[in-house]
Amino acid sequence: MDVIISTLAVFWLILAIFFILIKRGLWIFSDVSKSLSMFMLEKALGPAIDFVSGRPGSATTAWIIHGFDWTFAASTVTFVGLWLTHDPTALHSFESWGYHPKSSELIYAGRLTALFGAIGMMVIGASLHALPKLSGTNLASESNATLVSLLWTLSVLLMFIGSQNSVILGITILPVANLLLSLASIAIVINMVITVSEATKDIPFPGWLILFAVIGNIAAILAVFVSGAYEEGTGQWLHFHLSGGTFFFCGLAGGIMGGLIGYID
């Protein structure tokens, strides 16, 4: 219980520091650091950035399309998991291929793909549309946000694989998936923070919810390691609930309210 309380305290402290830094005018984002961050978002990626479209709205479209794809995958996997609950031998023919599907594993995989794949990608897609509208500016890098959607999809795919086989070739899959998800989250956070730094008006409440949603995953990882929850064995559970809850509720509320405000304006 102590490690859970300390993790929550560190998590909310990180979010409070993030809020204060942005509210004070983003002094950490001088012209030099902005230029360096934009270089990291685009030019540092090399030729890969040239394969994605940078037109306005392309990032939102890419994320939402990926989200719909994961919606289909999550619903299918969950259905198969529930089917195996009713009839455990329904897919016994797969055992000849070396695959032994279990109901609990498939339902768990369905939850992961639904939260981080379906809901997560559609929430980020809506946020990439709403936040620039709320800030009175354009998204800092449409190209990077589009490319990062592929990295996020890869991380969700590894989550699905890791829920079935936790260790492959001596490599624990879920930490690798979390690492890729964190890298994608950092890129999205930098993109949104640069966007907010160019805001032409005060950020309304839905905009803050969107920012907290995208910083939640990074804050959860830092909180788990700082509090020692990772060594206690509860790190994965805490990370899933902290990042998932913050991301889902803040992102969904911010995206919906931001979209409504943008529509009314």
Residue ranges of predicted features:
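Hydrophobic alpha-helical transmembrane segments of multi-pass integral membrane proteins
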Residues: 1-265
